[in-house]
Regions:
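Charged, glycine/proline-rich intrinsically disordered loops and linkers
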Residues: 11-51, 176-193, 321-360
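Short, well-ordered beta-strand segments enriched in hydrophobic/aromatic residues
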Residues: 215, 250-259, 390-398
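Ser/Thr/Pro-rich, low-complexity mucin-like regions
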Residues: 262-264, 338, 344-348, 353-357, ...
Length: 512
C-alpha cells in the first residue's frame, strides 16, 4: 500500500526541507530547522512499472491510504482547489482524479480514508474536512461525501477507516504530551484525532453511570459537592450555591450551581491549580482578586459564544512565531501574581513556501474556546448552562489541563535544565470559583471557598484497567446507506436487520 507522500505525481506547492530552506534564504529569512516533518514530495513510487504475466491472471491494482487533509499539497494545490463534483468544491476529488488518471487501466483502491470525530484538530482542510474537530454527525456526513468523491474519481474501491475508536493511537500534535506514551491505551484523549476515527465509539466510563452535558443533576447523584454555600438560596445571578467535580477516563467534569444564569449581570471564573499550591498565578484575571493557591488554568465563563479555558503564560505549550508552532520550553508552571492569562492557540498547519515560490500562511485556532451545547445536540459539547435550574456543567479533556496520563495522575512538568517534556505525579487539583459583574469586574461578587478559607485538594483514583463502553456512531448507518446507494443495491436496512434479526456488533465490555 502506498500513500500520497510517495505517489508518482509532482506537486508544485510541496517543497522539500532543502528546497524550502533555499527559498527562505532567497528572502533573507531563516527557516526554523526544528520543524519535524516528512519530505512529502521527494520520491515517488509508481505501481505502473509492474504488470501481471499470464501466470497471474488476477492482475494488479494500486492501493493508497489517502485522506483529504494531508500532506499539505492536498489542501494547497491550486488545481485541486478548482476541482468540484455536482455536490460542490472538493480538493480531495481533484487529487484523486489526477491519481486515478495517472494509473490508466490499472485499478486504484483507496484502502484508507475518513475523518475522526475528535475535539482536537490536527490539520485544516479548505472544505472543512479537517483532521479532527468534527462531531459524530459531521463525521458521518463527511465520510459519506468522501466516499462519493472516491467513486466519482473512477477509483475501483474504497475502505473506510476505521471500525472502532483506538485509544492506543497517537497524533503528531499531541504525542509529546501523552506521557508515558505506553500508557495512552489506558485513557481516551479527545484532543487526539488519531484515536477517534471509528464508526463505533469507545466511550470512557461505565455505560450506566456515564456523564452527559445536559444541565441536569441526575448523573451527579452520589457526588458530594466540593463546596456548598451557607447562604440562603436566591435568584441572584452572582450567587454561588455549590461546586462539584467528577472524572472518567476521558474528561474532568465540573458542575457549578448559581442563583440564576444571566450573563449580562454575572460571569464566572474557575481557577484550577493542577500541581503545587505555590506554583502558578496567584491572581484571577479581570477582577484582580488574590488567591492563596496558584492557578495554571482559569475557566472564563462569559456566555455561550465567548467562554474559554485560559492558561498561565509560562505553562502555555506553544508560542506561534512567524507561522511556526514553537514549544514554550521548559513546560513548567512558575510562581507569579500578574493575573495575565493566554488563550490556548495551536497551529495545525504551519507556514510553508511552495516550489512555486508562493507563501502559504499558517492556520491556527484557539483550542481553549468552549462549545456551548447539549451533548445530545453535538458530541463536541464542552459545557452547558441551564437557565431554568441554574446548573452549569463543563467537561474538559484531560489534555486541555496538561494531564499527560490521568491513569497515573501525571501532569506536565518539564525538565528545567534540558527543557524537555517530563511529567510528575500530582496529588490532585484545587479549585477556586468567583462570580463577578461584567459591568464592574472589580466590584462585588461571591467566591467559593471564601478568601480566608483553606482550599481543599480534590483527587481521583489511579487505574491500570480502564472502564469503557461501546456505542454506534451515526457513521455506521450512514455508511451502510452510502455504500448500498453507490453499488445500486436495495436501500440498506436499519441498524437492526428485521429479516435476519442480526444487530451491529456488540463488543465485550469490562465487567464491573
Amino acid at each position: 500500500t502506498n500513500w500520497p507522500t510517495l505517489d508518482p505525481l509532482t506537486h508544485i506547492t510541496e517543497s522539500t526541507k532543502q528546497e524550502e530552506a533555499a527559498l527562505y534564504a532567497l528572502r533573507g529569512e531563516k527557516r526554523d530547522t526544528s520543524v519535524r516533518e516528512y519530505d512529502n514530495d521527494a520520491i515517488g513510487l509508481d505501481a505502473k512499472i509492474m504488470s501481471a504475466t499470464s501466470a497471474f491472471p488476477a492482475g494488479l491494482f494500486a492501493s493508497y491510504h489517502a485522506y483529504p487533509y494531508y500532506p499539505d499539497f492536498m489542501v494547497l494545490d491550486p488545481d485541486y482547489n478548482k476541482a468540484s463534483t455536482p455536490e460542490g468544491p472538493s480538493a480531495y476529488y481533484g487529487y484523486l482524479k489526477e491519481l486515478v488518471d495517472h494509473h490508466g487501466d490499472m485499478p486504484v483502491v483507496i484502502s484508507e480514508y475518513g475523518v475522526p470525530s475528535s475535539r482536537g484538530m490536527a490539520h485544516w482542510q479548505p472544505q472543512g474536512w479537517h483532521h479532527g474537530g468534527h462531531d459524530e454527525r459531521a463525521q458521518a456526513d463527511i465520510d459519506a461525501r468522501l466516499t462519493r468523491d472516491i467513486h466519482a474519481s473512477g477509483a475501483a474501491g474504497a475502505v473506510l477507516f476505521a471500525a472502532i475508536d483506538e485509544w492506543f493511537k497517537k497524533n503528531w500534535l499531541v504525542i509529546d504530551f501523552e506521557n508515558p506514551l505506553e500508557r495512552n491505551r489506558l485513557w481516551l484523549n479527545p484532543l487526539d484525532a488519531e484515536q477517534n476515527y471509528g464508526i463505533i465509539a469507545m466511550r470512557a466510563g461505565v455505560r450506566d453511570s456515564a456523564m452527559s452535558i445536559d444541565g441536569r443533576a441526575n448523573d451527579w447523584r452520589g457526588a458530594k459537592a466540593l463546596y456548598s454555600s451557607a447562604a440562603q438560596p436566591s435568584n441572584e445571578p452572582l450567587q454561588l450555591r455549590s461546586f462539584s467535580v467528577r472524572s472518567d477516563e476521558a474528561y474532568l467534569y465540573l458542575r457549578l450551581d448559581v442563583g440564576r444564569v444571566d450573563w449580562t449581570r454575572a460571569n464566572y471564573l474557575i481557577g484550577i491549580d493542577t500541581y503545587r499550591r505555590d506554583l502558578g498565578d496567584m491572581r484571577f484575571p479581570y477582577t484582580g482578586a488574590a488567591s492563596n493557591v496558584g492557578f495554571e488554568f482559569v475557566l472564563d465563563l462569559r456566555g455561550p459564544a465567548n467562554s474559554r479555558l485560559l492558561v498561565d503564560p509560562p505553562y502555555n505549550l506553544y508560542r506561534i512565531v512567524d507561522g511556526y508552532r514553537i514549544y514554550n520550553r521548559p513546560f513548567r508552571s512558575q510562581p507569579n501574581e500578574d493575573g495575565q492569562y493566554d488563550s490556548i492557540r495551536v497551529a495545525p498547519n504551519r507556514r510553508r513556501i511552495g516550489r512555486n515560490n508562493v507563501d502559504y500562511p499558517a492556520y491556527t485556532y484557539d483550542r481553549g474556546l468552549l462549545v456551548h451545547a447539549l451533548q445530545s445536540q453535538t458530541t463536541l459539547a464542552d459545557w452547558y448552562a441551564d437557565s431554568t435550574s441554574g446548573i452549569i456543567e463543563i467537561r474538559l479533556a484531560w489534555g486541555m489541563l496538561h494531564v499527560t496520563d490521568p491513569s497515573s495522575r501525571t501532569v506536565l512538568h518539564g525538565d528545567a535544565e534540558t527543557g524537555e517534556v517530563a511529567g510528575v505525579e500530582t496529588d490532585g487539583f484545587r479549585f477556586v470559583v468567583q462570580s463577578f459583574d461584567p459591568r464592574t469586574p472589580r466590584g462585588s461578587g461571591e467566591r467559593l471557598p471564601n478568601a480566608e478559607a483553606a482550599v481543599p485538594t480534590w483527587t481521583w483514583q489511579m487505574w491500570e484497567e480502564p472502564r469503557w463502553h461501546a456505542e454506534i456512531k451515526p457513521a455506521f448507518e450512514t455508511m451502510r446507506q452510502t455504500f448500498a446507494e453507490l453499488l445500486g443495491l436495495p436501500a440498506a436496512v436499519e441498524a437492526t436487520d428485521q429479516r435476519s434479526g442480526t444487530r451491529p456488533p456488540r463488543l465485550r465490555e469490562p465487567k464491573r
